[in-house]
Design a protein with these regions (language model features):
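Cysteine-centered metal-binding/redox modules
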Residues: 5-8, 13, 28-150
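Terminal and domain-boundary regions
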Residues: 19-22, 28
Length: 150
């Protein structure tokens, strides 16, 4: 499966990590499986960065009301709703948010010694749409109700 749908991450200028850009070049000639990005941090970062650019994954810091104000206003406008209602549509309740025990354990193990703590604190899951470790407090333009997958 091609990770980049409409463009290349390198098309987006300076807001990219060198590791993700290197992985993008490497992946031109390789195929990956959805869960490969759980153990490959560069692939995870590539998939996440593409989702930020193509599907407006965010906000950067969901707990920062002031800093994420424009993000939520844009989401509300896109979905033709109020900011308050848009804020109820999060990765944590998306149908593509995989929080099956086996998935969570694999994520925690890949993180390392503090994996279980980090997974719990950030409410991490795996995005089945875009193949990256996803924070439950965020959202994207592809959000679909009815989740998570448990």
């Amino acid at each position: 499966k091609d990770l980049v749908i409409e463009g290349k991450l390198s098309d987006y200028g300076l807001n990219n990590t060198p590791a993700a850009l290197r992985k993008e070049k490497e992946m031109r000639f390789k195929k990956s499986k959805p869960m490969d990005s759980i153990t490959d941090l560069d692939l995870n970062t590539l998939s996440r960065n593409v989702t930020v650019k193509e599907y407006r994954y965010g906000p950067l810091n969901p707990e920062d009301e002031k800093g994420s104000k424009k993000f939520w206003e844009d989401k509300a406008e896109m979905w033709d709703t109020t900011v308050e209602h848009a804020k109820t549509s999060r990765c944590s309740n998306c149908s593509a948010f995989n929080q099956k025990p086996a998935t969570i354990n694999k994520i925690a193990k890949a993180i390392g010694d503090q994996g279980k703590k980090i997974v719990k604190q950030s409410n991490i899951g795996f995005c089945e749409f875009f193949w990256f470790k996803c924070a439950g407090a965020r959202t994207c333009d592809a959000w679909v109700g009815g989740g998570p997958i448990t």
